[in-house]
């Protein structure tokens, strides 16, 4: 039976590349036992983004700095996927408002029960 496992290796150069330095610093801050798991997850997440648009992981990688915020990442995703992000945002707003309506209805019922009892 053939072993189908694959070893993936590449070098990071933190002295030359700022993104590589951020990656190395982050990996150094993680317990050694968790690093392989994070490396695998990061590769898988990058490939998931690549499958949506091959530019995505490269843009995120190139624009990563110590100051990169979640909002910066969302803005990059908005520029690459304007329709999908707009659809995503509208579904969140719809969910949020219907959840608020449900909470309001529940609160009204509770208040009514207090008046009855």
Curated annotation (Swiss-Prot):
Q: What is this protein's record name?
A: Protein StbB
- Asked if the record carries the keyword Cytoplasm, the reply is no
User: Which Pfam family, giving just one, matches this sequence?
Assistant: Plasmid_stab_B
Stretches for region Disordered:
92-117
Report the function annotation for this chain.
This protein is thought to be involved in the control of plasmid partition.
Q: Mind listing the GO biological process terms from this record?
A: plasmid partitioning
Q: Which gene does this sequence derive from?
A: stbB
Provide the alphabetized UniProt keywords. Plasmid, Plasmid partition
